[in-house]
Design a protein with these regions (language model features):
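Bacterial Sec-dependent N-terminal signal peptides
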Residues: 1-28
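A short acidic, helix-capping loop that chelates divalent metal ions and anchors anionic groups
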Residues: 67-72, 105-109, 142-147, 206-208, ...
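Conserved beta-strand positions in the central sheet of alpha/beta enzyme cores
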Residues: 60, 98-100, 135, 173, ...
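Active-site acidic/histidine proton-transfer and metal-coordination neighborhood
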Residues: 91-92, 105-197, 205-206
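Active-site-proximal loop/turn and secondary-structure-junction residues that shape catalytic pockets
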Residues: 38, 63-65, 102-105, 138-142, ...
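N-terminal pre-domain/capping segments
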Residues: 24-127, 184, 192, 278-290
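Histidine-acidic metal/acid-base catalytic patches
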Residues: 27-33, 41-57, 180-290
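Charged helix-capping and loop-helix junction motifs
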Residues: 75-82, 113-120, 148-158, 210-216, ...
């Protein structure tokens, strides 16, 4: 009788041990972050405690506005301000997973006369803050679906960015409007391991493409990070066109790991209720991925 009880006890201990290891592995494989800009805290130190409150592990910090300036309105190159951000991040156990050059959503990366300084400033900031990923959206003016004639300019400029990023030991993740096959071809033309796809779920979803197939086409090695939300309208848990469990199954099979970054998918009735929108989406993502 005693021997039987000991066997049961050993079995339970082993089960709990392996369960703990699986949970730890899942947490290491998928981490959840949020975009400071979309939390209405663009380059504001208050984004750090807010990130902790809504339950994410990381932040994508914005480089600041661009407009017609030669470079971003970036406070993070100020030593004292940057030190405050780093201290707060340590205090709240928040990781800066990426720096976003969101100014290029509106400004033209492919047509801007002096694009190099802005990229250099982003990479310099990344190095100073030990951030390994930069986000570069090609934006409305470099939409390669609507303006395929811009492809040569985009490839040439990305090759230059790739050399800069490679020399610094960082990766720049790009967002385009191309489907996965065309984006994979673009990455091949650029030919740099320092230029990858920063995949955004909303792009295939709003264009009627198969999100899960697109992930598989691009493949594990080409995707550096993921904006894991749809357009604004409903929260992730209420989104009927986005099967997050199927997303996880797809990423698991691909062997992909990294940061899943909450950007949009805000409730249209309360778009500025940051704690509700990001708190709900963070909890939902953690319930599936962690």
């Amino acid at each position: 009788m005693m021997m039987q009880q000991n066997k049961i006890l050993i079995f339970l201990l082993l089960f709990l041990c392996f369960s703990g290891i699986e949970k730890l592995f899942a947490q290491q494989r998928y981490n959840i972050a949020a975009v400071d800009l979309m939390m209405l805290k663009r380059q504001k130190i208050g984004a750090i405690p807010l990130a902790s409150q809504v339950g994410v592990q990381g932040l994508e910090l914005d480089m600041g506005g661009l407009g017609n300036r030669p470079t971003f309105d970036n406070q993070l190159l100020n030593d004292s301000i940057r030190a405050q951000f780093l201290q707060q991040a340590k205090a709240f156990n928040i990781t800066f997973c990426s720096l976003s050059m969101s100014g290029y959503y509106a400004q033209s990366f492919c047509g801007r006369e002096n694009f190099v300084q802005s990229i250099e400033d982003c990479i310099r900031t990344m190095k100073l803050m030990n951030v390994k990923v930069g986000f570069l959206p090609l934006g409305v003016q470099c939409d390669l679906v609507k303006h395929p004639e811009l492809m040569e300019s985009v490839v040439s400029r990305l090759q230059r960015v790739g050399k800069m990023a490679s020399a610094a030991g960082v990766v720049i993740g790009i967002e385009t409007t191309l489907d996965a096959s065309a984006e994979k071809k673009l990455l091949k033309q650029v030919g740099s391991n320092a230029i990858k796809s920063y995949f955004n779920f909303s792009n295939p979803l709003k264009n009627g493409r198969d999100l899960y197939k697109e992930l598989k086409i691009l493949g594990r090695k080409n995707i550096i990070q993921i904006h894991c939300t749809d357009d604004d309208g409903v929260l992730l848990k209420d989104n009927t066109r986005l099967d997050m469990k199927k997303v996880k199954q797809t990423l698991d099979k691909m062997g992909w790991s990294g940061w899943l970054v909450l950007e949009r998918s805000r409730d249209a009735k309360e778009p500025n209720n940051v704690k509700k929108n990001f708190g709900s989406n963070a909890a939902y993502m953690k319930s599936i991925f962690q």
